[in-house]
């Protein structure tokens, strides 16, 4: 099977949906294959381990929740204050509600991070990168 970026993205999106719908215990290669309507074994060809699945999910969540640069450029031109703060919050809520599966999957990862140090480490790295991008 030829690996390609588009299929990897489709599988990562399927993994996000599986995690959001079934929780951490339901996140398996087979469940991802089924959700993506891909032949059995496809997800394991792209993601050799659960850690690789988690990394792909975090990358995909990051891409899906990325702020619109035009909106943020507009907000950056406004004077600081309560209204600006409210606009930033509205933008965050809008992105989370438009990407419900990604938001729920992120909560699932936060729960799993309390039990699995590798997930906690990946989530911390992801959050720090997001913070640096915001600064």
Residue spans for each PLM region:
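Short, basic, alpha-helical segments at the C-terminal edge of helix-turn-helix-like DNA-binding modules
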Residues: 59-66
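Solvent-exposed, amphipathic alpha-helical segments
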Residues: 10, 14-22, 67-71, 105, ...
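Helix-turn-helix
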Residues: 10, 14-56
